């Protein structure tokens, strides 16, 4: 899974990485995002630890990076080894392109990088992303699960749609293209908002998708759009649990919530948090170690 700023350079880059337990994942992701153009995190199935790595200009923002990591170490009670490796921009971009071919997802979608010049797969809805900053979006199990879940509930024709923690904007764009509806998309990170807006524009969806920075459900702009018929939240298990009450409050009586960013072993925990607020399981989808949940109100 990745979040992105902008990495479009012809100069040398470096990759900075740490390996941390799950409870510290969000903290170290935020620390690297403060100075890195793109950040990804990857689960080691054998150890249960997470590799968090970011790409930035080589030697740039050193004081800020060291300060962010020191504060994060103190907050997490950890001192993970910080590893660095030089990464040439041209080589990094070439590897990213080669690792990001067209990716068919489910029955309807295909995810394409901007570097691809051939025609999209026939009979599928293309969603175009900048491969340089969106690597991790299309092939990640949580994203694929959300897109499959969207196909599953499309027959309900939801009208009011929210993508919470939009990242690259991929889920809002897929919903707008499949359902021909408007959508709201939010993210707490300013760079994610910029990236999502760029992707929305390159997909010709600016009239349909409105992207703004928001901290979860606290923003009036988010709340005024409620109740929502469809809510995406492809984030992580802990914030999903924290926001369960708000999701229940602002989800329409017959609405559906598509939640992901959680591992299969976290399903019971996340479900328990949402059941306390009257939401029940409608469907579960699996992609590798990742799970996607479709939830509804108990009366829906």
Predicted features along the sequence, with ranges:
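Conserved beta-strand segments of alpha/beta enzyme cores
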Residues: 40, 81-83, 110, 182, ...
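N-terminal auxiliary segments of SAM/dcSAM-dependent transferases
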Residues: 11, 17-120
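SAM-dependent Rossmann-like transferase core, predominantly class I methyltransferases
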Residues: 90-156
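Conserved beta-strand segments that form the floor/walls of ligand-binding pockets within enzyme
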Residues: 15, 110, 128-130, 187, ...
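Conserved SAM/SAH cofactor-binding pocket of Class I
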Residues: 133, 137-220, 227
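S-adenosylmethionine
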Residues: 188-299
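Surface-exposed loop/turn positions
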Residues: 107-109, 159, 209, 255
């Amino acid at each position: 899974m990745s979040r992105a700023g902008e990495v479009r350079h012809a100069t040398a880059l470096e990759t900075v990485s740490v390996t941390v337990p799950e409870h510290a994942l969000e903290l170290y992701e935020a620390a690297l995002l403060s100075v890195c153009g793109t950040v990804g995190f990857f689960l080691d199935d054998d150890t249960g630890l997470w590799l968090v790595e970011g790409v930035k200009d080589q030697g740039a923002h050193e004081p800020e990076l060291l300060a962010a990591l020191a504060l994060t170490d103190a907050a997490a009670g950890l001192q993970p080894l910080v590893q660095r490796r030089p990464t040439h921009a041209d080589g990094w971009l070439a590897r990213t392109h080669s690792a990001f071919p067209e990716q068919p997802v489910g029955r309807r979608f295909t995810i394409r990088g901007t570097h691809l010049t051939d025609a999209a797969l026939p009979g599928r809805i293309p969603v175009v992303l900048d491969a340089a900053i969106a690597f991790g979006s299309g092939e990640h199990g949580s994203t694929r699960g959300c897109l499959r879940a969207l196909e599953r509930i499309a027959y309900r024709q939801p009208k009011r749609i929210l993508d919470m923690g939009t990242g690259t904007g991929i889920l809002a764009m897929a919903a707008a293209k499949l359902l021909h509806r408007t959508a709201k998309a939010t993210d707490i990170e300013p760079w994610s908002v910029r990236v999502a807006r760029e992707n929305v524009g390159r997909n010709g969806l600016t009239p349909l998708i409105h992207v703004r920075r928001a901290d979860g459900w606290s923003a009036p702009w988010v709340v005024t759009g409620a109740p929502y018929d469809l809510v995406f939240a492809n984030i992580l298990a802990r914030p999903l649990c924290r926001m369960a009450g708000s999701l229940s409050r602002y989800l329409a009586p017959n609405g559906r919530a598509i939640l992901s960013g959680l591992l299969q072993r976290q399903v019971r925990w996340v479900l328990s948090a949402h059941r306390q607020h009257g939401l029940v399981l409608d469907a579960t989808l699996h992609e590798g170690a990742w799970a996607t949940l479709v939830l509804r109100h108990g009366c829906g």
